């Protein structure tokens, strides 16, 4: 699917369908975001500038800001950003599909997180997004990406299906754009340091 097709699907999605915990209850949804923000706080430097790309309606961005991080919430869906702003008007938002994140921010950031986003995109689209996310992060900054590897990688067929990658394909992209894989140290998501490309 194209990036625009995925964004259109999110724009039309019922709020109850955007995360499995929301189908349980709003409290479960909120707690899942708080738990992930707490886990991210063990990875990210305290108080750093962090962009939550694919922030949706703020499930992780809002509690991360509550932990003292300087959070910018970024998403390709204005519908999602409007919901976030309604819940947390003090969290700045940026409308972007990720490919132009650096231009939309107008600055480099210390870190980018992107959870449950790349899995919804084709290889080609995800590569373009990851390139855009990397371009927005200062050298030595961090990227925490929900970017799964599988023994039998497969490209998802629709916006709700999951794309998985081979480690070799990930490593080739990382080498080309300047990402160094770090020890995950108990993180469920791969962690990368922004380095000079090549």
Regions inferred by a protein language model and the residue ranges of each:
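Local beta-strand N-terminus motif with an aromatic residue
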Residues: 47, 109-110
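Conserved beta-strand/loop positions that form the S-adenosyl-L-methionine
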Residues: 53
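A conserved beta-strand element that flanks and buttresses the S-adenosyl-L-methionine
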Residues: 113
């Amino acid at each position: 699917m194209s990036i625009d097709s995925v964004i259109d699907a999110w724009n039309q999605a019922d709020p109850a369908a955007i995360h499995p915990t929301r189908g349980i209850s709003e409290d479960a949804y909120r707690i899942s975001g708080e738990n992930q923000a707490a886990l991210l706080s063990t990875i990210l430097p305290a108080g750093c500038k962090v962009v939550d790309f694919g922030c949706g309606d703020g499930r992780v961005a809002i509690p991360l800001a509550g932990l003292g991080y300087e959070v910018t919430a970024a998403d390709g869906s204005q519908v999602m950003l409007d919901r976030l702003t309604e819940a947390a008007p003090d969290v700045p938002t940026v409308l972007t599909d990720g490919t132009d994140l650096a231009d939309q921010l107008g600055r480099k950031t210390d870190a980018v997180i992107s959870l449950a986003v790349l899995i919804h995109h084709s290889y080609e689209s995800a590569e373009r997004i990851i390139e855009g996310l990397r371009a927005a992060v200062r050298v030595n900054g961090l990227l925490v990406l929900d970017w799964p590897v599988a023994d039998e990688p497969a490209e998802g067929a629709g916006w709700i299906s999951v794309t998985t990658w081979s480690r070799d394909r990930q490593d080739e992209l990382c080498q080309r754009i300047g990402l160094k894989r770090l020890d995950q140290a108990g993180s469920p998501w791969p962690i990368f340091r922004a380095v000079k490309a090549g």
